């Protein structure tokens, strides 16, 4: 994972000896060049990927390696990863907590128009598979690279929740009476397969590739899924498909935590390897952001093509929301604007809560998961009853 390092050493330079030893111990490929009198700068002169890197930067990166297997459970090297994992588990839920009785009534009684049914079917056709791909990203790519135990625990916790998301949206499909063939129907739509192809394009074999993959992971979970969330939640505002809305609310809360964890992972990578995110890489980030915007616009057009505006939601609003969220997610990763034409304010005011992941459950009408398991601390004292 660590890129090839070229160092120019100087006779009698203690730091040169220390760096060469560290590179050898970490099995980092490196080339040692002979001293050339008259070359300015402090020694060793190190270059990584064609960029000159200071001695302190490179030794810090070697010491804070996220890619080395932990020798023991504690001490944690990355406390934030354990904190996020704990927060994630405290809002655990399972698909059996969802009540879809009213959704079936809405679907079969005529409350949902044929156009609205087509709209929901289009989104659900892809949604389960999207969560399959997100789970695969964690298990097949990120956990194969990050060997630090607390980071892996966070990532596997995220992957396990994606399995629950898959089951929840599958339960919705099955309860509404959609046949199993609907799970493969996405393959007939280029607007859907193109989105999935983009999600699968991950290269974690190099540090720049890993940084780009982390950005893509945030775009996948923090942008693409949220566009679909908006389209499904619009029915909840009209009192329709409330069970589906609850699945979305709980998924939103999870995905926000996932985005938080992956964004922090990106920031940590950038902090430990500050030479990785270059101007050229940021240009690639912008290309990825534009590609996501293009893919989402095509999918939005597909979803709306049979029904036009749904419950007051216009296609352009969703497209603008995608652009807005792309820049918002980028800012939270410490990156500049990736799309200049994006609106500065949220174009759909009623979905501002999505980014916070708040749960809007009515306590008296539904199960509640807006709680923290084990959240109470301190001691409990009471007087014995005089019976």
Swiss-Prot record:
It catalyses: a 2'-deoxyribonucleoside 5'-diphosphate + [thioredoxin]-disulfide + H2O = a ribonucleoside 5'-diphosphate + [thioredoxin]-dithiol. The active site is at 169. GO terms for molecular function: metal ion binding; ribonucleoside-diphosphate reductase activity, thioredoxin disulfide as acceptor. Binds 2 iron ions per subunit. Heterotetramer composed of a homodimer of the large subunit (R1) and a homodimer of the small subunit (R2). Larger multisubunit protein complex are also active, composed of (R1)n(R2)n. Belongs to the ribonucleoside diphosphate reductase small chain family. This is Putative ribonucleoside-diphosphate reductase small subunit 067L.
């Amino acid at each position: 994972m660590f890129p090839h390092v070229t160092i120019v050493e100087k006779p009698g330079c203690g730091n040169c000896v220390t760096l060469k030893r560290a590179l050898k111990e970490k099995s980092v490929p490196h080339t040692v060049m002979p001293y050339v009198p008259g070359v300015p700068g402090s020694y060793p002169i190190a270059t990584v990927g064609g960029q000159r890197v200071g001695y302190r930067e490179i030794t810090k990166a070697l010491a804070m390696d996220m890619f080395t297997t932990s020798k023991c459970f504690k001490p944690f090297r990355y406390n934030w990863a354990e904190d996020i994992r704990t927060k994630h588990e405290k809002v655990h839920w399972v698909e059996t907590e969802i009540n879809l009785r009213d959704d079936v009534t809405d679907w079969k009684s005529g409350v949902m128009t044929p156009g609205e049914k087509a709209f929901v079917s289009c989104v659900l056709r892809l949604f389960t598979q999207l969560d399959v791909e997100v789970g695969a990203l964690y298990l097949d790519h990120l956990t194969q690279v990050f060997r630090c135990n607390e980071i892996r625990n966070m990532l596997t916790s995220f992957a396990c929740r994606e399995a629950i998301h898959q089951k929840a949206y599958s339960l919705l499909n099955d309860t509404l009476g959609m046949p199993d063939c609907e799970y493969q129907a996405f393959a007939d739509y280029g607007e859907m397969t193109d989105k999935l192809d983009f999600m699968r394009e991950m290269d974690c074999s190099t540090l720049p590739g890993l940084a780009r993959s982390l950005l893509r992971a945030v775009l996948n979970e923090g942008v693409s899924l949220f566009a679909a969330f908006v389209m499904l939640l619009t029915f909840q505002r009209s009192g329709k498909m409330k069970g589906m809305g609850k699945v979305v609310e709980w998924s939103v809360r999870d995905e926000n935590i996932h985005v938080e964890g992956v964004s922090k992972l990106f920031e940590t990578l950038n902090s430990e390897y500050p030479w990785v995110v270059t101007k050229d890489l940021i240009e690639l980030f912008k290309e990825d952001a534009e590609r996501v915007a293009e893919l989402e616009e095509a999918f939005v057009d597909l979803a709306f093509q049979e029904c036009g505006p749904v419950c007051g939601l216009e296609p352009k609003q969703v497209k603008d929301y995608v652009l807005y969220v792309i820049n918002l997610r980028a800012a939270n990763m410490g990156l500049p604007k990736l799309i200049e034409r994006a609106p500065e304010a949220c174009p759909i005011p009623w979905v501002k809560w999505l980014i916070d992941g708040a749960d809007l459950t009515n306590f008296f009408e539904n199960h509640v998961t807006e709680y923290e398991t084990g959240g109470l601390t301190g001691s409990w004292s009471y007087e014995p009853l005089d019976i």
